[in-house]
Each structure stands twice: as C-alpha cells, then as structure tokens.
C-alpha cells in the first residue's frame, strides 16, 4: 500500500513485497537439505507470482542479495564462514530455480506442436502440458524433450485404454 501511494510501478511494488515477506526464509534453510529447498522453490513456482522461470530465478537472485545484506548487518557479518555458507545456500536455491523448476508450460522442453503427433484429441494439449509441468516440478520427470515425449506417449496410451474399457 505504501509503495502504491508513493507511485511505484505495480510490478516493482509486488516484487518488493515478495522480497520483504520472504527474506527471512533463507536463515532456517541453512540447516535443511536440498529436498526442503526444492519444495520451497516449487511452492513459489506454482504460486502464480511469476510468469516464467527467468522471472523466478531473477527474484531468487534479488532475494539472495537481501538475505546476504540482512546477514551482514548481524553478527554473521563478522563471520566469513557463515557468510560463505549463506551465499552457498542462496546459490543452491537459484540453481534449483534456474534449472529444475519450470514456472509455466512454456518453460518445458516440449510444446503443443511436439505433442500434436502423440495426442489424439488436440483439445487435450493443455491438459497434457500441465500434467508434464507437474511431473517436472515434482522431480519425477526431467525437463528433457525425449523424457517428456515418452511420458506423453505413456499418458496417451493410458487415456486411450481407459476410454476403450
């Protein structure tokens, strides 16, 4: 609300609110494993705040800077090892966002044209893409063209078999 009154652009204000509301999330993550980090990034990717993986990665890069500045303002600022651990943690989260967490179906290694050869009902293309997106986000499927096409073929076979029953 303050950002709006000060006439900052809406997207900028939303990003500032996102950064402020999440900058303390990093601290407890220093004691967790990659699965917890992945779950956090997955939640943010699916939350509707970001349109692309690039936006998500940019936001986490900015969050890293806020987190490190916050750490530097505390006793951790005098502890180079602790600051290095914080930097490594933030880099790990950015890496997950950049390489393992698609935000939108457009971030997948396949598109509707690729699936047209597999799907018998073109109206279901969006459903298949969302299915593949969820599989990649969950870590059950790599975001690689061959793996996605194989998963789509398998899903189409199951759908066809179910319809024939």
Predicted regions and their residues:
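Charged substrate- and nucleic-acid-binding regions of tRNA-handling and nucleotidyl-transfer enzymes
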Residues: 74-165
